[in-house]
Design a protein with these regions (language model features):
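Alpha-helical transmembrane segments in inner-membrane proteins
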Residues: 1-322
Length: 322
């Protein structure tokens, strides 16, 4: 009975997302003018696809990460990918300037971001995980230290940077769906699909892994290998989303916990689906609000940061009372 209720809730969420998509694609469009209509569709379609891809990558990665760490108020941003993204772009502007190839070419910037973050994720969260005897808490601590390290270097560079370059850099460090093109979208989808395919066996074992290490091993699961591969997959998913649109630190916290509270189940297939759908609704709704109400004066990341901060405090207070 509970499974049927959750399926119904997921269906309602899906309908809300479809309505949000339809609203985003049609609000303010001049249907009577063929050229204006075609122009609006050409501008909005890549943005919508980017929001759907971002919601999928962050939503699924957040649920998996929380299950690995066994804590529902942590987010994958603790792995340091957001700060590494900021450091990469700050270094490019500091060394080569705002007129350099990497600063003006979105495709090249995406490729470099993804390559560096993917390499860092592979070296740190695969190699060091083995070196720490497969202790996820050590890995979480390493991620927190790296976040502070990347942030300190980035802050130092911005303090000695030319003010004009810094002003241009600020717009590049804010999450935006405006500079996404078809080449970036295709490459992002390819990366996400390849990672999901490579981890299909581990993803199927998530329900067992959350029982605990001893129980999972007793059931025949290679626990350490599964956790290591899933952690690497989470990092690559977050790296892909961050390289595509920029850092969205609180989004994972919001949508993962909304999914857990809305569905009240331990089935990861349903939790991940709910998290992805909530992510789509939040991003599309926020983008629509930013474009139509605030007329591009406030980026969507501000809404997510403010809402995520308030929601985080709510989670802390409610869990403390519980």
């Amino acid at each position: 009975m509970k499974t049927h209720k959750n399926h119904l809730r997921l269906l309602i969420l899906l309908l809300l997302v479809l309505l949000a998509c339809a609203g985003y694609m049609t609000v303010g469009v001049h249907f009577e003018n063929q050229k204006l209509f075609a122009y609006a569709m050409r501008i909005r379609t890549p943005k919508l696809i980017a929001m759907l891809i971002t919601a999928f990558s962050i939503g699924s990665a957040s649920i998996v990460f929380q299950s690995i760490i066994n804590n529902t108020i942590v987010t994958p941003c603790l792995l340091g990918m957001d700060q590494l993204y900021s450091l990469i772009h700050t270094a490019v502007f500091f060394v080569a300037g705002s007129g350099s190839f990497l600063a003006v070419n979105a495709n090249a910037a995406f490729a470099v971001d993804l390559a560096i973050m993917g390499a860092v994720a592979t070296v740190i969260y695969s190699y060091l995980f083995r070196k720490t005897n497969h202790n996820v808490l050590y890995v979480l601590l390493i991620g927190t230290v790296l976040t502070s390290f990347f942030s300190s270097i980035q802050t130092t560079l911005t303090r000695v940077m030319d003010p004009n370059e810094y002003d241009t850099l600020l717009t590049d460090l804010v999450a935006s769906f405006s500079n996404v093109n078809s080449a970036i979208l295709v490459l992002s989808v390819a990366v996400l699909v390849l990672v999901a395919f490579a981890l299909r066996k581990e993803l199927a074992l998530l329900d067992v892994l959350t029982l605990g290490k001893d129980q999972a091993i007793n059931l025949g699961v290679d626990y350490d290998r599964c956790i290591r591969r899933l952690l690497l997959g989470v990092t690559l998913y977050i790296a892909t989303a961050t390289a595509m649109v920029g850092p969205l630190a609180f989004l994972g916290l919001i949508i993962a916990n909304l999914s857990r509270q809305f569905l009240s189940t331990y089935r990861h297939s349903q939790l991940i689906t709910g998290s992805v759908l909530f992510g789509m609704a939040v991003l599309i709704g926020g983008q629509l609000l930013m474009e139509r109400v605030f007329v591009y004066s406030v980026p969507v990341s501000v809404f997510i940061t403010v809402g995520g901060g308030v929601y985080f405090l709510y989670l802390l207070l409610t869990q403390r009372k519980a």
